[in-house]
Amino acid sequence: MLKLNLEGIYNFLDWRKHTQTYAPQIKSIHQKLHQDKQLKEKYLGWLELPLHFDFKEIEKMKQLKNFHPNLDVLVVIGIGGSYLGAKAGIEFLQTPFKKTKPEILFAGHQVSGNYLTNLLHFLKNKNWAINVISKSGTTLEPALAFRILKKEIEEKYGKQLAKNRIFVTTDSQKGVLLNLALKEGYQTFVIPDSVGGRFSVFTSVGILPFVFANLDVASMMKGALQSYHDTFQEDLLQNQAYKYALARYLFHTQQNKKMEILVSYEPNLLSFSEWWKQLFAESEGKEEKGLFVGATNNSTDLHSLGQFIQEGTKMLFETVLNVSSIKDDCVVPHILNELDNLNYVAGKTYSQINQKILQATRQAHIEGKVPNLEIVIPTLDAYHFGYLAYFFQKACAMSGLLLGINPFNQHGVEIYKQKMFALLKP
């Protein structure tokens, strides 16, 4: 199960005093989250989703997948929360060197003609389908990609057969994409109206790609459900998600920290870090408040950003995501003719060495006046992906409400869109 280690912050904060001070406020916010009907109806469709998850929907998705047994590629079209959760879950659980069938590829998450042209070339001799994800259908990046990929798939299979290869995840009642799907006769899946994109990983937005990627969705939802129960505690001392949220809040408001870095030590967590960045940045970056969130993947980034973190401006704190046990591992061999001077690690696994690097780095950074939280999970499996993703969602809600902002909207995103459309439209 997940463990939150706060030993790396005690030199920087009077933690006991602060927990006593903020426990009543956190209890009040918790009650608001779970009892405010207006808030729940508008924004919190994700909050109790693990409790009421519709497993019949998974069977519907499996039937759809089985209808295309020879599919080589599913192209998931989306941006922001419409693709980050799916990408995070798939890369959390799969090795990059063992491709599943179908392979899950992504489009519509940028405007790169080079990327899309090469994707089309890759798909030319493949058996493929599309899952386009957008609540409204008006977000430019995925809409552009869908226009081009829709044309391509219709030219390859013919319009009638192509419509059985296009799956639409969108609003249930309204929107350009829904209207298009109904007119064309595409299979549709629903994004609940009360679930924002960055909180949508356990809806059809994430689950359909997970099913096509052959992930264990049932175990994932068991993990999310356990996380729901564990974070349902209104008592701060019994709720690790709320402790994490409070620590973030205190470093930002009382220690004047400007940035949080999520530190991981496994490449499988690179896309999870991107999902985490969107979750917190889009939730808290309002009213000139909020931490700037970044991510490092060590030990790679110890040879680039590590210098700044150790001795640069003391503007940040770190949250280390530690996976304590790795399924697939390497052992360093012993060599008699030791020309490389590495026999001091002979017999050790890569995981054991990686853990020593993690421990040494935390110690060095704490001594370098960089506060360190540590979140430990036992392994990289579907259960712990579900647990961890829900943990961060709940922590994010508490963290934003502690700041006094609404963590569930994102009006700032619309500003660049307005200016972009003004430049693009005649």
Curated annotation (Swiss-Prot):
Annotated pathway: Carbohydrate biosynthesis; gluconeogenesis; Carbohydrate degradation; glycolysis; D-glyceraldehyde 3-phosphate and glycerone phosphate from D-glucose: step 2/4
CDD domains to which the protein is assigned, alphabetical: SIS_PGI_1, SIS_PGI_2
Any one Gene Ontology molecular-function term assigned to this protein's record: glucose-6-phosphate isomerase activity
SUPFAM superfamilies: SIS domain
Enzyme class, UniProt record, top EC level: isomerase
Active site, UniProt feature: E282 (proton donor), H303, K417
Reactions catalysed, as given in the entry: alpha-D-glucose 6-phosphate = beta-D-fructose 6-phosphate
Keywords, in A-Z order: Cytoplasm, Gluconeogenesis, Glycolysis, Isomerase
Record bears the keyword Cytoplasm: yes
PANTHER family in the cross-refs: GLUCOSE-6-PHOSPHATE ISOMERASE
Family as reported in the entry's similarity comment: Belongs to the GPI family.
Function: Catalyzes the reversible isomerization of glucose-6-phosphate to fructose-6-phosphate.
UniProt protein name: Glucose-6-phosphate isomerase
Species of provenance: Aster yellows witches'-broom phytoplasma (strain AYWB)
Gene: pgi
